[in-house]
Amino acid sequence: MIRFAIVAIVLVVAVGLNKLLSKRTVQAPTQASPSMPTQIDRKDFSEATKDWLVLAFTSSSCNTCADIERKAVVLESRSVAVDICEYTSHREMHKKYAIDAVPTLLIADAQGVVHKGFLGPASATDIWAALARVRDGQPDPHEGECS
């Protein structure tokens, strides 16, 4: 009888410990995703009087950044300013706008409101089309989609 009681107690303790430990499972860590600014101060960048700003945050060690720079500079016009903020020479701007991934390309209006942004590689067609849409006041057909 005593053996049965000891076995029952050990069994109850084992089941209790199992339930307690199974509740303490470690959740997978949440990965922060890179974010883009929604507002910028146009005075921080060249030609603040133009209607639009195409702003590329880049790094000299990034091959994709060089491609984005080439695609951005051709957008400059009478109403569109283009500014390239390379990390080593504009580190303070990367910190101010919390740029944590490059290339980041933003299209902002005269008040500094960011209407469209690209994180990572983007085609020239997509960048041109995005600028045309925001200048014409058209909604982004891909807004809210995950890619």
Placement of each model-derived feature along the sequence:
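Local sequence-structure signature of Cys/Sec-based thiol-disulfide redox active-site neighborhoods
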Residues: 44-71
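Short gly/ser/thr-rich secondary-structure transition/capping motifs
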Residues: 35-40, 84-88
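Thiol-based oxidoreductase modules, predominantly thioredoxin-like and allied folds used
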Residues: 78-93
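N-terminal targeting signals for export/organelle localization
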Residues: 1-36, 146-147
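Iron-sulfur (Fe-S) cluster-binding segments and ferredoxin-like electron-carrier domains
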Residues: 67-81
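Thiol-/selenol-based redox modules, centered on thioredoxin-like
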Residues: 122-147
